[in-house]
Amino acid sequence: MKIFDCFLYNDENLILDIRFNTLSKFVYKFVIVESKFDHQGNEKKLNFKIENFKKFKDKIIYLIIEKFPEKLSNWERENFQRNYIVRGLTSANENDYVLVSDVDEIPNLSKITDLNNFKYTAFEQKIFYYKINLENKTNPFWFGSKICKKKYLKSPQ
């Protein structure tokens, strides 16, 4: 079983480092999508630097969106960027697993027992706001990261 961990990236180096170190023993490839534009359509610099993560270099598939289609709303730009993930799955076979989440949604993959019983699975995760030490105690859990076999993936969004 191979897992392709897929997410959007902006400038979250610390959380990305935590994600790589937490999930690398479970993940075959990390598919990272970054855009030259923010979700409002403003140009921005690319922030991902492979040299900051040399230890994981062979596991990283880094995709850059050069340009969004015209006349997209903010949400449509985000959806376009998330759907761009499929371009990084060309080496995945139909029975490999595709994990889709935000970079700061780090699932506990050691809890995976038997995914074959389900087409789709969502991970119940703790909610933190802005920083690792700001946990939501009122509503502490939500369903964040999702995983399925590539053959069942209709859209990463």
Would you name each region that the model predicts?
Residues 2-4, 23-38, 57-61:
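Short loop->beta transition adjacent to catalytic acidic/histidine clusters or analogous donor-positioning motifs
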Residues 35-100, 109-110:
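Active-site-proximal specificity loops/subdomain of glycosyltransferases
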Residues 1-25:
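N-proximal low-complexity "stem/linker" segments adjacent to membrane-targeting elements
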Residues 105-157:
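Conserved catalytic core of nucleotide-sugar-dependent glycosyltransferases
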Residues 3, 28, 96, 104, ...:
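Conserved acidic residues
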Residues 11-15, 22, 81, 95, ...:
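Short, glycine/acidic-rich beta->alpha junctions
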Residues 10-13, 36-38, 67-69, 104-106, ...:
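Short, solvent-exposed loop/turn segments at secondary-structure junctions
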Residues 19-26, 113-119:
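Short, surface-exposed basic-aromatic patches at helix termini and helix-loop junctions that form
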